[in-house]
Amino acid sequence: MEIKKVEGKTEEEVLKGLDIKDIHYEITEVPAKLFKSKKVELKYIEKDEIKNYIKNYIDNFAKSLNKTINVEIRENEVGYNIMLISEENSILIGKDGKTLNSIQLLLHQAINNLTGFNIRINVDAANYKSNKERKLEREIKRICKEVLNSKIEAKLDPMNSYERRIVHNIL
């Protein structure tokens, strides 16, 4: 993957000729020096390069496990949704989705270290995370009704930050 840099006097000049939909970019202003005017610097990477990197990363991961994993990458407004398809999804998911979360963390860190961009990545296998979200949502709504009726506090099981965010959004 190659991070490209473009310099210019204004943001419009720097973005000229680039399709914003096809790149991840960061614009920084370089302050003016004694006899020089200020500059605008654009760092960008193409989304196709990131998709290829994700596929290669997962393929190397699969080779180290001696497994075959197919990868589907969908782009959304904030990042990428990656669906892992394998005959042995239980190995990819792990207990309570911990292996899946670890894969997601490693992939996010690898992309962040390589590009310097904070790109959101969501890794899922066999729709495990979406099913878990629905179960969690139903359970939280049920517990909320019980608390409202009985006026007694309820304690929830320990959750990771993503699950806590879902709970806060429901409440």
Task: Enumerate the predicted regions with their spans.
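RNA-contacting regions in translation and RNA-metabolism proteins
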Residues: 1-170
